[in-house]
Every structure is written in structure tokens, then in C-alpha cells.
């Protein structure tokens, strides 16, 4: 396994001082060459993060642990009987909260009111941070401020924003199942608050799996497929996975700031060179991309892009014939 010492960690405090150019260069390099980075001093209070961690772990213990143990027993039995089936299972307990365009947190069962209020506060902080990061990316890309958030909002004027809350309990057979199988994320920019004592998250870089180091009060950021398309491939989404662990229960709170379902996604014209004879990335509606993604999530992203390029070509040919 590749060493983790060079994994990009960015101190956002440096963006306010004389070291801003170096920090922006580090951010640009992380987006170009890693698709992942970790940020410190990001503006979300450590007290809020500690409270979120405590209540999330308490919620799992109180509500979800027994359900997961029942699932785990069945999963291991099926996996032992059928290895091919085990390869398609994920060793995780999850629930999903939608924040935008409309929140569903009031409808999720088994959440106490204090936890609901806390998650709404945390989501508001993460939304602000996501938009701040997108503007920093615009600056590095030479795009006007707000270009990416505007592209994400679509005709309806709102992005899609939600949080996946996951627990990865100890697994007695990590040789049999993954915590979460390898995939790229379909959307825009993903902000992860992960456990600082139990690892397992890995990304694929230069053909090797690299550990994403757990760091207290950090936020891990990764780029989704939509940013790869909009940046015309300058920034990349990256395959990542969670490896099941024999010890410890890993907490993961991943918030996805994605385009609105009606947003039309295509490379930013400013990032497409005039001499490009072949269009590298397609144009599509985000909702259509998601329909394809859910069927092929755990596969390479390139065939998804090619499928939409083929659709574009067919449409253009029909128009030309008409």
C-alpha cells in the first residue's frame, strides 16, 4: 500500500494571510492530482463537531446496532455460502437526510428532536463551507466567482444537498465483504466528517490504494463526477472505498453538495480549448445522469460519460437529418 505522508492536508487559515498563494496552489494540486484532500481550520466549531459525533454514535447504539447485528448475521451466512454475493454487499449501517431543495429530516423515524436540530445546524455550516470551497475552485480555475454554485442551481434555483450518516461496525470477516465497495461519487463536492480513531477509507491513486488519514476535527473533501465534467477533466473524481475493520466502529457523516435535478451539466466554455477536435465530456441533465449512476455505481465512470456522449451524437444526427 502506498504511503499516506503526502496526502494533501490544507490549513484554511492560511488563505487569509501572506501564505494564501501557496495554500491555493496546494488546493489546486490536490484537486488535479488527488481528487481528495483534508482541510483544517475550516470554520466549523469543534464543539459542534464533538456534539454531532457524540449524538450520532449514541443514536447508532440506541436505535441501529441491534438491527445491524441481525443484518450482519444473515450477511455473513450468505457470504460464506456464496462468495459472488458477498462481493456485492456493504458492511455498513446508514440513513440519509435530505436538506435541499426540501428537508426530510422531520420524516425520518427514530431521530430524537435534539438530534434533528443538531443535524440541521451542522448541515447549514457544511452548506456554507461547500459553497466557499467551490468559489476557491473557481478562483484556481480562472472562472468567475459563483460559476460553480450557479451551474449547480439549475433552472429551479437550488442545488441538491443531503447527508449520508454511516456506521461501519467491527467485521469478523473483512476478507469476505467490504465496508463500502469502490466507486466514484456521482455529484459535485463531498464533505466528510469521519471518525478520528477508526480508519478504513481509501482512495485509488496511481494504481494503489492509499489510506485517508483520520484527523481530529478535520473535514475530508472529495470531488464528484460533475466537477470532472464542468472542469473538462482538469479536476478528477477518484475511486474510493471503505475497508471493513475487525476492531472499532467507524463513524462517517458524508454531505453531498450536488447539482439540482434539473441542472444542465457540461464543460465550462472557458475551460474548453478551441483546438479540441473531440469533445471530452458530454452535456446532460443531472437527474438523467443519476438514473444511469444508480445502476452502475460500483463500476468505472468512463462508460457513463461515453453513454451520454453517444446520446448527444445520436440527437445531433437526428437533428441534422431532419
Curated annotation (Swiss-Prot):
Top-level taxon of origin: Eukaryota
Reactions this protein catalyses: 1-aminocyclopropane-1-carboxylate + L-ascorbate + O2 = ethene + L-dehydroascorbate + hydrogen cyanide + CO2 + 2 H2O
InterPro entries, A to Z: DIOX_N (IPR026992), IPNS-like_FE2OG_OXY (IPR044861), IPNS-like_sf (IPR027443), Oxoglu/Fe-dep_dioxygenase_dom (IPR005123), Plant_2OG-oxidoreductases (IPR050295)
Cofactors, names only: Fe cation
Domain Fe2OG dioxygenase: 159-259
GO MF, one annotated term: L-ascorbic acid binding
Record-level GO BP terms: ethylene biosynthetic process; fruit ripening
Pfam families: 2OG-FeII_Oxy (PF03171), DIOX_N (PF14226)
UniProt KW keywords: Ethylene biosynthesis, Fruit ripening, Iron, Metal-binding, Oxidoreductase, Vitamin C
Induction notes from the record: By flooding.
Binding positions (Fe cation): 183, 185, 240
UniProt EC number: 1.14.17.4
Pathway field: Alkene biosynthesis; ethylene biosynthesis via S-adenosyl-L-methionine; ethylene from S-adenosyl-L-methionine: step 2/2
Family assignment from sequence similarity: Belongs to the iron/ascorbate-dependent oxidoreductase family.
Protein name: 1-aminocyclopropane-1-carboxylate oxidase 1
Gene coding for it: ACO1
